[in-house]
């Protein structure tokens, strides 16, 4: 009987959840940045091996909310934990041992799903982590086979939920918006990427190339000027970087048109969050 189930990738911000998801599925799906809190919405990646299908969900980092967007991120992370068949609880190997997930997530009760502690970034640790966890390095691939084998034991017997050739469940337009944000994290400095959101206004696959028109939202006029840059240089560079990422994912040429608008205090405004796809 085949096995199939959801695996939550949970933990504090910047512990390597997105990098691990990408390494497990063999595709760049989730935003990766040295800056914390880059993941705002769960990203689902699929791995099918022989008679087992893993539905990995990269969740926002567990944090103490400072404003309404953080509240939605925390709520999304807790839903991922609550819905999972098995939880991969990530913690940096260099900071072992890991505190209990129930404390980090401030849960009222332990999760119903079994928890496997995963010590990430093992290539950066000076010493092996303590027993009771699995050390992995998404960079070198060390420990990934052991992690997959351990997770497989907890998947329920079930037919596959998705075609074995599929790698993701979300539409391309979702990843297009995410890759625009990833480019912003790469090219913009300090706090500006946290004030930026992206909305896909038009997505057209035919005729070629794939045409995408998107709006980049910031909170202040001064931020708009920075994102556009002198003579439009910054927004052009951002668009080029994002277009390359999208084209690589879908293996098709892409024309990406970006506009920049101000949406004041959108991170603290429930209707704006809903409009931008962040459930309140």
Task: Indicate where each model-derived feature is located.
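Conserved G1/Walker A P-loop phosphate-binding module
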Residues: 1-86, 91
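Conserved, well-folded catalytic cores of nucleic-acid-processing
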Residues: 27, 46, 50, 80-87, ...
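Conserved glycine(s) of the Walker
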Residues: 16, 143, 234
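Solvent-exposed alpha-helical segments within well-ordered globular domains of core cellular machineries
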Residues: 22, 41, 45, 75-82, ...
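P-loop NTP-binding site
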Residues: 172-280
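Conserved C-terminal guanine-recognition region of P-loop GTPase G domains, centered on the G4
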Residues: 46-54, 71-135, 187, 204-208
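Canonical P-loop GTPase G-domain recognition
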Residues: 112-172
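Catalytic P-loop NTPase motifs of RecA-like helicase/translocase cores
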Residues: 39, 62-64, 96-97, 125-126, ...
């Amino acid at each position: 009987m085949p096995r199939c189930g959801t695996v939550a990738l949970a933990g504090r911000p910047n512990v390597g959840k997105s990098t691990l998801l990408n390494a497990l599925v063999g595709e760049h799906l989730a935003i990766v940045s040295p800056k914390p809190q880059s993941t705002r919405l769960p990203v689902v990646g699929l791995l099918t091996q022989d008679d087992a299908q893993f539905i990995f969900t990269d969740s926002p980092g567990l944090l103490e909310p400072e404003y309404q967007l953080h509240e939605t991120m925390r709520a999304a992370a807790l839903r991922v934990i609550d819905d999972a068949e098995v939880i991969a609880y990530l913690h940096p190997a260099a900071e072992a041992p890991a505190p209990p997930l129930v404390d980090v997530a401030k849960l009222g009760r332990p999760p119903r799903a079994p928890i496997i502690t995963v010590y990430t970034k093992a290539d950066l640790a000076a010493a092996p982590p303590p027993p009771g966890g699995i050390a992995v390095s998404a960079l070198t691939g060390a420990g990934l086979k052991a992690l997959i084998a351990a997770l497989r034991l907890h998947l329920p017997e079930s037919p596959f939920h998705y075609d074995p050739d599929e790698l993701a469940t979300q539409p391309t337009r979702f990843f297009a918006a995410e890759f625009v944000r990833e480019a912003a994290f790469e090219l913009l400095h300090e706090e500006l990427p946290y004030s930026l959101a992206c909305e896909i206004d038009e997505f057209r696959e035919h005729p070629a190339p794939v045409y995408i028109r998107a709006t980049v939202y910031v909170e202040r006029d001064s931020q708009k000027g920075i994102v556009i840059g002198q003579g439009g240089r910054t927004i052009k560079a951002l668009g080029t970087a994002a277009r390359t990422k999208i084209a690589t994912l879908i293996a098709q040429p892409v024309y990406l048109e970006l506009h920049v608008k101000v949406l004041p205090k959108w991170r603290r405004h429930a209707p704006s969050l809903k409009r931008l796809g962040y459930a309140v």
